[in-house]
Design a protein with these regions (language model features):
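Repeat-mediated protein-protein interaction surfaces in helical alpha-solenoids
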Residues: 83-89
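Pocket-edge structural micro-motifs
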Residues: 78, 89-91, 107
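Aromatic-lined, polymer-binding surfaces characteristic
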Residues: 94-185
Length: 185
């Protein structure tokens, strides 16, 4: 009986929180919140993208500390955890998973000396995150990861760029283009 009351009380708190949040949204924001939750994300399958011109080194500074030294154990937001093959494991907080999907390690301090690890992270991400599935395919994660990948790719000779990486990069850019965040404007 007491458990039922607590469940009902928690549900009422969530309802009032939702109501209080929704009342400040514009109609367009509300529409796109519902639209993006109902609509299934898709990624258009494309042919292999072609490189146009030579890539040059990215001139930006590296200021972040690496979050991983082995590609298996990561520290984000003060929480260290060992990652298996599941980049979307529900036991990790969503913000922690977002940080994992950003792949900031590709451009962290000393990353130029960790090429094998960077390649492993990209290959592992592609293998564990099919197109349009999971946290990594949400717009904010996509936008940050795309920038990190491009910056990292710019440090490689074009013959070292794997075909799978370019296809994934193209799919991610396409997916981001299809998920404009009207619901937060």
């Amino acid at each position: 009986m007491q458990t039922d009351c607590r469940i009902l009380e928690a549900a009422m708190k969530r309802f009032w929180l939702l109501l209080n949040t929704v009342r400040y949204l514009k109609l367009s924001q509300l529409f796109y919140q519902v639209f993006y939750r109902v609509r299934k994300r898709r990624s258009k399958i494309q042919s292999e993208p072609e490189l146009r011109g030579a890539l040059g080194p990215w001139p930006g500074a590296q200021f972040l500390q690496p979050a991983s030294v082995d590609g298996k154990t990561f520290t984000f937001l003060g929480q260290t955890a060992r990652l298996g093959d599941d980049w979307n494991h529900p036991s990790f907080p969503k913000l922690w998973l977002y940080n994992l999907h950003y792949q900031d390690d590709l451009n962290a301090k000393g990353s130029e000396d960790r090429r094998e690890l960077s390649e492993y992270l990209i290959d592992s991400w592609i293998a564990a995150n099919p197109p349009a599935e999971g946290n990594g395919w949400e717009p904010y994660c996509l936008s940050l990861r795309l920038v990190n990948w491009v910056k990292w790719f710019c440090r490689l000779e074009s013959q070292h760029l794997k075909r799978e990486w370019l296809i994934s990069l193209s799919r991610q850019a396409d997916s981001l283009e299809r998920q404009l965040e009207f619901h937060i404007l």
